Each structure stands twice: as C-alpha cells, then as structure tokens.
C-alpha cells in the first residue's frame, strides 16, 4: 500500500480512543506512528497507519462499529480545513461536494467522490483499493463524520435515503439504523456510498459563510499533502516487527526469528528495495531494526 495521510486523521481516532480509556500514545506506537508525527509540524504519515489505528481501536475496546463513533465528542477543527470547508458551505449538497473536491488534502489512500448528482439525488462514494477491517471502519467514519457535520450545520436531522457498505452485514445493525435514521442500509455492496434526496441536499447551512468559504477554497486549491518523512517508515516497521511473536509456533506462522525483509515489505505494502531505501534515508538498516525488535521482544 502506498500513499499518505494527514496526522489529523490519526489524532481524530486517538481522541476517541482516549475518551474510551485507552492509552493514545501506546495505541499510536502500535499503529506505527511516532510522537514526532503527532506533535511536530504539519506533515503526513504512511497510509497504512490510519487503517491500523481503527483496527487496533476496535480490537482493544471490544465494541462493534467504532467507525460510527467518529461523530461522538466531536470538536470543531479536528480535521483542520476540511471542517471549515464543510461548515461554511451554503447547503448540505455543497458541503458534500467540498469534502469530495478537497479530500485529497487529508489522504491520498482513499477518496470521496460525487458519483451521482441528479435532479432528485446526490450520491457520494468512499473509494479505496484497500481491503480489510481498517478500510471498513474508515468508511463508517467518513460517512458518520459528514452526516454529523451537516446535521449540525443545517440544524436538521439529515437522513440519507440509502447507505451501502462493502463490509459484510454485522449480526446486529441497529447502531447503523439508529445513527443514519433509515433502514435503507445495504451490506456486502460493491461500494461504500451514501445518497441524499433533493430536500436534504438543498437544505441551507445556518453556519454558511460565503466569504470565508471562498477564502478556504482558494487556500485548499493550492494546498497539498506531503510525503511521509523517512523516519515515519522506521516507526511503521517497528510496529510491524513488534506485532510478530518472538518464535515460530507453526509451519505457516511468521516470527521475529524467521521473518525476511521481503516478507515484511509485503506486509507493509511496498517492495524490499523501497523499504531499504527508506530506512537508509532515515539513517538505519533492516538488520539494525530487526535486531532492535528482537531485543525488545526478549525484554
């Protein structure tokens, strides 16, 4: 997997993890995000980290549908410019269009796009080539965030006429029905989509600010998401190595005593050569990082 994400997305998850009683520093480290990425100047982290955060969050809190909880305890500005592009838009529909147009300022690994905008409906799709639970939770979070934000801005309970998810149907989808306000939710679909009818699409935002919206759009047009620094890949590698058992427990298992550079590169969605180059840029090597992981495992 290639690409990068804004640290704002990681902080978004970690804020909710902290509220749930988890240690955000430890959770970030387990996902491959070092303190420098979160506390330093604006930058980016490897695209794997955000999805790993969601997976770890769900696993440790042991509650289903944590992506839907993205709307809980929301603080204005958590997602930076994106928050204000959505809130200052003239209508709900314009907010969705702004989120789709400028979403690449937050992530290059996933995209939100308007796939239908007709006389009667507006449909957005959260697209990614990535499979797995992290991607499923990220899709939940994207739709939960947008729905909650436009409800707040419009001062109305915006109810989608249809929502589809690629994920398999959960045993109980009451939480989805309760949050979105509709039973028209399909699981196992070909794409993650959310559809609004004309009435909700054209609802006016009480927080609309045309002048500020224009300034924000001009700024977003020239903004771009940076490439993760070399050190970010060292943090991600350390997290991946630390997730392996010290010794092999079965023929098919991977452990710290058997893992190869090629295998770990595959797990990180890159090539062995690229991983070596990134480690060299950070002033380290595969052998050094593997030795460090074995020392940590030995305790």
Predicted regions and their residues:
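N-terminal low-complexity or simple alpha-helical regulatory segments
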Residues: 1-122
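Short amphipathic alpha-helical face segments that pack within enzyme cores
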Residues: 12, 141-145, 297
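Residues within well-ordered alpha helices
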Residues: 16, 26-27, 149, 240, ...
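Short, contiguous, pocket-lining structural segments
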Residues: 19, 134, 138, 229, ...
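N-terminal regulatory/effector-sensing and dimerization cores
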Residues: 80-200
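Extended mid-to-C-terminal alpha-helical interaction segments
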Residues: 170, 178-299
């Amino acid at each position: 997997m290639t690409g990068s994400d804004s640290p704002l997305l990681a902080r978004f998850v970690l804020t909710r993890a902290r509220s749930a009683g988890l240690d955000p520093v430890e959770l970030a480290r387990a996902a491959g995000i070092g303190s420098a990425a979160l506390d330093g100047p604006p930058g980016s982290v490897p695209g794997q980290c955000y999805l790993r955060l969601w997976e770890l969050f769900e696993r440790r809190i042991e509650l289903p549908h944590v992506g839907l909880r993205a709307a809980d305890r929301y603080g204005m500005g958590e997602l930076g410019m994106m928050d204000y592009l959505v809130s200052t838009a003239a209508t709900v529909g314009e907010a969705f269009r702004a989120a789709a147009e400028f979403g690449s300022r937050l992530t290059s690994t996933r995209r939100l796009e308007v796939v239908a905008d007709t006389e009667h409906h507006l449909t957005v799709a959260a697209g990614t080539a990535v499979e797995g639970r992290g991607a499923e939770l990220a899709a939940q979070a994207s739709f939960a965030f947008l729905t909650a934000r436009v409800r707040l801005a419009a001062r109305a309970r915006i109810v989608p006429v249809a929502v589809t998810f690629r994920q398999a149907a959960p045993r109980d989808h009451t939480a989805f029905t309760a949050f979105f306000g509709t039973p028209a939710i399909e699981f196992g679909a070909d794409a993650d989509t959310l559809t609004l009818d004309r009435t909700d699409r054209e609802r006016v935002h009480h927080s609309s600010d045309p002048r500020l919206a224009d300034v924000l759009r001009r700024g977003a047009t020239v903004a771009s998401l940076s490439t993760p620094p070399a050190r970010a890949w060292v943090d991600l590698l350390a997290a991946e190595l630390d997730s392996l058992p010290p010794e092999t427990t079965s023929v098919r298992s991977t452990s710290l005593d058997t893992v190869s550079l090629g295998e770990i590169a595959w797990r990180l969605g890159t090539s062995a050569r690229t991983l070596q180059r990134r480690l060299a840029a950070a002033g380290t090597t595969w052998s050094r990082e593997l030795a460090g992981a074995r020392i940590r495992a030995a305790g």
